[in-house]
Amino acid sequence: MARKIRRDDEIIVLAGKDKGKLGKVLKVLPAADRLIVEGVNLVKKHQKPNPQLGVTGGVIEKEASIHVSNVAIVNPKTGKADRIGFRFEDDKKVRFFKSDGELV
């Protein structure tokens, strides 16, 4: 089944501690139905130093995954959350915004 939200899509968080935040999808994890979104769901990770890899230790902040049901794609025309549909154009499956029918 095709994914409604893909990498580099602009999304808005609908639920959770980061509700209302906008971000760009960095990575899609289809097996778990989760996304990694830039600047959203930040967690602190305690990193152990590893001189062989040149990694310094300390506490780093990184993005954790968020479930796909807690986000919606943003329609650039309206700037609001929108739903996605699929249709065929010239024997090719394309995504479109349900509110205005424009292609994603």
UniProtKB/Swiss-Prot annotation:
SMART domains given in the database record: KOW (SM00739)
GO MF annotation: an example: rRNA binding
* Cited InterPro entries: KOW, Rib_uL2_dom2, Ribosomal_uL24, Ribosomal_uL24_CS, Ribosomal_uL24_KOW, Translation_prot_SH3-like_sf
* KW Isomerase (keyword) present: no
The protein's UniProt keywords, in alphabetical order, are: Ribonucleoprotein, Ribosomal protein, RNA-binding, rRNA-binding
Q: Coiled-coil region(s) at which residues?
A: none
CC per GO annotation: ribonucleoprotein complex; ribosome
A Gene Ontology annotation in the biological process aspect, one of them, is:
translation
SUPFAM superfamilies hit by this protein? Translation proteins SH3-like domain
Q: Which domain of life is it from?
A: Bacteria
**Membership in a protein family:** Belongs to the universal ribosomal protein uL24 family.
Q: How does it assemble?
A: Part of the 50S ribosomal subunit.
Q: Its function?
A: One of two assembly initiator proteins, it binds directly to the 5'-end of the 23S rRNA, where it nucleates assembly of the 50S subunit. One of the proteins that surrounds the polypeptide exit tunnel on the outside of the subunit.
Name of the molecule in the record: Large ribosomal subunit protein uL24
Give the organism, scientific name. Answer: Pseudoalteromonas atlantica (strain T6c / ATCC BAA-1087)
